[in-house]
């Protein structure tokens, strides 16, 4: 099993390039950064993680800028979005950003995506909450055309463009791995149709169904759709840095465990990284 670490990289935390060096030096496989363009000062959308939304949600750097800084000082560390809010981004520009980071990193980018939870944030981007999943699907399919075709063309409900040239193309072919976040009733449909893996948050697998059972269901659905079940990567966000917890994840069929790090300065973060590194 591979191990990664995630942090809301902010203006008051350890720099993303410094964090990347620390992780690579200690044998971590990957580094992950989340995304929020902003947080509306007034909102009714509940945060899935609890009552009070941490301020790092509105202080976080742009993920592609942070990961480019990380790429510049590392050679093997994989670099992922966890997750990118595709529904808040223009797909033509996003396709270029993904391909650019993948090329500048030498093919180390992992594209974690999701639909988000903050209705007010989405509304500021002119995205309708109820249609966000249809929008996400089209944008991903359109980006795949841009990444894989010399003259890309796409005509859908939300995304529409005639033949065009768009470079760079990603190093990884046909494109960087796409991992779907979330754990809703239709998540597996999206994973099987247009993604390369599933990336749920630890402890949110739903009542009555264990993580291991869900992984079995996902692999079965993939097989029924004609896909190789082994090609579906399982990545767990927010894994508990404890030997027993890691052993349970591995037994369940998890391919990658990602530890959460606080958005804090270097002196606070380094001891936590060192403790997590003992599990690698």
Region annotations inferred by a language model:
Residues 1-280:
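Active-site-adjacent structural elements that line small-molecule/cofactor binding pockets in enzymes
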């Amino acid at each position: 099993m591979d191990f990664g670490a995630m942090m809301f990289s902010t203006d008051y935390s350890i720099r993303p390039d410094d964090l990347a060096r620390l992780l690579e030096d200690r044998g971590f496989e990957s580094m992950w950064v989340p995304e929020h363009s902003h947080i509306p000062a007034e909102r009714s959308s509940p945060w899935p993680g609890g009552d009070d939304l941490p301020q790092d949600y509105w202080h976080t750097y742009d993920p592609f800028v942070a990961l480019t800084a990380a790429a510049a000082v590392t050679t093997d560390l994989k670099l992922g979005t966890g997750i990118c809010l595709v529904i808040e981004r223009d797909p033509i520009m996003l396709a270029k950003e993904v391909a650019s980071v993948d090329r500048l990193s030498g093919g180390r980018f992992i594209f974690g995506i999701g639909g988000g939870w903050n209705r007010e944030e989405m509304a500021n981007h002119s995205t309708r909450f109820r249609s966000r999943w249809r929008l996400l699907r089209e944008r991903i399919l359109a980006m795949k055309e841009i990444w894989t075709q010399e003259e890309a063309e796409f005509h859908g409900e939300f995304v529409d463009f005639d033949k065009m040239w768009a470079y760079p193309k990603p190093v990884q072919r046909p494109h960087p791995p796409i991992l779907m976040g979330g754990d809703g009733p239709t998540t597996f449909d999206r994973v099987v149709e247009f993604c390369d893996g599933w990336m749920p948050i630890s402890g949110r697998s739903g009542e009555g169904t264990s993580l291991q059972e869900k992984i079995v269901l996902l692999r079965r659905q993939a097989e029924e759709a004609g896909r190789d079940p082994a090609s579906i990567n399982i990545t767990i966000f927010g894994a508990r840095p404890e030997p027993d917890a890691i052993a349970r994840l591995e037994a369940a069929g998890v391919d990658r465990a990602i530890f959460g790090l606080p958005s804090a300065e270097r002196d606070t973060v380094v001891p936590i990284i060192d403790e997590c590194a003992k599990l690698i």
